[in-house]
């Protein structure tokens, strides 16, 4: 992706977040974006929208299906994308919208990787640790299970990581023995 394309994507995303923020609709926008991104993942819609083989009329039909229960701001955004023929960039724009919402609201997704599934008590403790250590509000808690960690956990928030896994400790111990 070129710098020009990246700047275009960021401008569209920032504008949408700015409008939603002015109207106190960030939560609704975030829900809309997550639902549409889920559709992208389950249907490979991104490939269809970015393909030159798919006619513009077909792309209009596909995006019209996405307009269902969205907020006014999201539907206006989708109309603007269609009008300016920027469908190929929609997936990246929506990803950038989520990043912008996180920055504006200081609310980031938290990814927790552990060797076993977390209990509700552990999840609430993770949220407390995230709030204290990273000075952010925990957004969605994304839980991953990786038995190779042996024990402990890895918390990842906004490109920052806390790794207390036994696997990492064993690797560090192994390096110290060399």
From Swiss-Prot:
The opening ranks of the lineage are:
Bacteria, Bacillati, Bacillota, Bacilli, Lactobacillales
Q: Which UniProt keywords apply?
A: ATP synthesis, Cell membrane, CF(1), Hydrogen ion transport, Ion transport, Membrane, Transport
Question: Which Pfam families does the UniProt entry name for this protein?
Answer: OSCP (PF00213)
Compartments where located: Cell membrane
- Give the main localization category: membrane
Gene3D superfamilies assigned to the protein according to its UniProt record, in alphabetical order: N-terminal domain of the delta subunit of the F1F0-ATP synthase (1.10.520.20)
Task: Write one Gene Ontology MF term.
Answer: proton-transporting ATP synthase activity, rotational mechanism
Gene expressing this chain: atpH
Quaternary state and partners of this protein? F-type ATPases have 2 components, F(1) - the catalytic core - and F(0) - the membrane proton channel. F(1) has five subunits: alpha(3), beta(3), gamma(1), delta(1), epsilon(1). F(0) has three main subunits: a(1), b(2) and c(10-14). The alpha and beta chains form an alternating ring which encloses part of the gamma chain. F(1) is attached to F(0) by a central stalk formed by the gamma and epsilon chains, while a peripheral stalk is formed by the delta and b chains.
The record gives the membrane topology as: Peripheral membrane protein
Task: Tell me its family.
Answer: Belongs to the ATPase delta chain family.
Task: Kindly provide the name given to this protein in its UniProt entry.
Answer: ATP synthase subunit delta
Q: Which GO terms describe its cellular component?
A: plasma membrane; proton-transporting ATP synthase complex
Fetch the PANTHER family from UniProt.
ATP SYNTHASE DELTA CHAIN (PTHR11910)
Please name the InterPro entries in this protein's record.
ATP_synth_OSCP/delta_N_sf, ATPase_OSCP/dsu
What task does this protein carry out? F(1)F(0) ATP synthase produces ATP from ADP in the presence of a proton or sodium gradient. F-type ATPases consist of two structural domains, F(1) containing the extramembraneous catalytic core and F(0) containing the membrane proton channel, linked together by a central stalk and a peripheral stalk. During catalysis, ATP synthesis in the catalytic domain of F(1) is coupled via a rotary mechanism of the central stalk subunits to proton translocation.
């Amino acid at each position: 992706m070129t710098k020009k394309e990246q700047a275009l994507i960021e401008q569209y995303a920032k504008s949408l977040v700015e409008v939603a923020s002015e109207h106190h609709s960030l939560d609704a926008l975030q829900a809309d974006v997550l639902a549409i991104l889920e559709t992208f993942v389950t249907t490979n819609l991104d490939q269809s929208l970015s393909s030159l083989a798919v006619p513009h009329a077909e792309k209009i039909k596909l995006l019209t299906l996405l307009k269902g229960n969205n907020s006014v701001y999201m539907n206006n955004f989708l109309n603007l994308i269609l009008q300016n023929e920027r469908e190929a960039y929609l997936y990246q724009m929506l990803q950038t919208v989520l990043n912008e919402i996180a920055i504006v609201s200081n609310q980031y997704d938290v990814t927790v990787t552990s060797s076993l599934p977390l209990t509700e008590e552990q999840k609430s403790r993770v949220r407390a640790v995230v709030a204290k250590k990273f000075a952010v509000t925990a957004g969605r808690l994304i839980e991953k299970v990786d038995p190779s960690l042996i024990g402990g956990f890895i918390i990842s928030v906004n490109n920052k990581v806390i790794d207390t896994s036994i696997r990492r400790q064993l690797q560090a111990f192994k390096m110290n023995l060399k």
